[in-house]
Curated annotation (Swiss-Prot):
Keywords: Glycoprotein, Late protein, Membrane, Transmembrane, Transmembrane helix, Viral envelope protein, Virion. It holds the Pfam family Baculo_E56. One of its GO terms (cellular component) is viral envelope. InterPro entries: Baculo_ODV-E56. The gene is E56. It comes from the Viruses. The keyword DNA-binding does not apply. The chain crosses the membrane at residues 154-174, 320-340. It comes from Autographa californica nuclear polyhedrosis virus (AcMNPV). Expressed late in infection. This is Per os infectivity factor 5. The keyword Transmembrane applies.
Length: 376
């Protein structure tokens, strides 16, 4: 089995430590260089009711769970990979890319889009909105984005989103198109990677989505025909959202996050799924999330991010220019005084070296001619 298949297999709770040690031995046979120093130190945490959470004991005595190892390696979360696998090299981290491609792991694309969306909402807070008024205001503050999206609407071609739905241009206005796309996001998704994980096919798991947008248009969203873990619709699935409280749980899903606290209703065991498949909860989009999903963050700002960077440079240059001019003036005056001093030293009064070396004047004596007496 491949590295990510073996890593997925240990992403579950165990009845005892010995069972995990056995599975981890199999994992080590497929572990690439740079990662064995951590995976060679298996450990467990007793979380009660004969359940043991598997993981690894780091050199600083910190415990990291197998679910966290799965999450950071599948997401290509380089900062956290470096934090866990101390001293790992760039080539060793890059080796995971090929292993992900072998198993069609799709997670890293979602992680990249989520990271981009978070940056959009942080740097341009006006995009963190879900109302028509908020979207209109965000478009007005970002004219390049507005112009580009308007051109997309003129083209009329729908765009597939990470949630499996489409950004369609069928409403009377661009703002309403955006609101419709936002309303069709949020929930539990079953994701299957294709073409080395570069393409992801996602569908919405309605029975694991405990809070749907009231304006969700199911005809514009791909609904899963069955549940990949509970295909026979047992009571465990049909009753999953009983007692759901969004204000307490702060998420729209249950049974959709393999990295969640095992005692929370959000946790799910996906260890039986192939490495190229996963379940994930995606919270309802804001306009900023939509911009990040579409990869249009480069258009934000009055002149886009590039123009914004140029404006920052111009601002810095403007502040430094008076200082630069002052320094230049001082240097110029100093140069003038230097030449004046040199001139005075060379061409000044007698004495000294100058007098000793001055050339001797040439004196020309003019004599009257001697008269001659003519013979008489």
């Amino acid at each position: 089995m491949s590295f990510f298949s073996n890593l997925r297999a240990v992403n579950k709770l165990y009845p005892n430590q010995a069972s995990f040690i056995t599975d981890n031995t199999r994992l080590l046979t497929s572990t690439p260089a740079g990662f064995t120093n951590v995976l060679n130190a298996p450990s467990v945490r007793n979380i009660g009711n004969n359940r043991f959470q598997p993981g690894y004991q780091l050199s600083n005595n910190q415990f990291v769970s197998t679910s966290d190892i799965n999450r950071i390696t599948r997401n290509n979360d380089v900062p956290n990979i470096r934090g866990v696998f101390q001293g790992i090299s760039d080539p060793q981290i890059n080796s995971l890319s090929q292993l992900r491609r072998v198993d069609n792991v799709p997670d890293f694309n979602y992680h990249t889009k989520q990271t981009r969306s978070n940056a959009v909402k942080q740097n341009f807070p006006e995009t963190n909105v879900r109302t028509p008024e908020g979207v209109q205001n965000a478009l007005q503050q970002n004219p390049r984005l507005h112009s580009y999206m308007q051109s997309l609407k003129v083209g009329g071609t729908g765009i597939l989103l990470a949630t499996g739905g489409y950004f369609l241009f069928s409403a009377a206005t661009l703002v309403q198109d955006i609101i419709n796309a936002i309303n069709n996001t949020g929930g539990s998704y079953y994701v299957q990677g294709k073409d080395a994980g570069e393409i992801a096919e996602a569908c919405l798991l309605l029975q694991r989505t405990c809070r749907q947008d009231p304006n969700l248009n199911q005809s514009d969203v791909t609904i899963c025909p069955f549940d990949p873990l509970l295909p026979n619709n047992p009571p465990e699935l049909t009753n999953m959202c009983q007692g759901f409280n969004y204000e307490v749980e702060k998420t729209v899903c249950r049974g959709s996050d393999p990295s969640a606290d095992p005692d929370s209703p959000q946790y799910v065991d996906i260890s039986d799924l192939p490495a190229g498949q996963t379940l994930m909860c995606i919270e309802p989009y804001s306009f900023g999330d939509l911009v990040g999903d579409l990869g249009l963050d480069w258009l934000l700002g009055d002149e886009g991010l590039v123009g914004k960077s140029s404006n920052v440079s111009d601002s810095v240059s403007g502040k430094l220019m008076p200082i630069i001019l002052l320094i230049g003036a001082v240097l110029f005056l100093g140069l003038i005084f230097y030449f004046i001093y040199r001139y005075m030293m060379k061409g000044g009064g007698g004495g000294g070296v100058g007098a000793a070396t001055s050339p001797t004047p040439i004196v020309i004596s003019m004599q009257n001619p001697t008269p001659t007496t003519a013979p008489r």
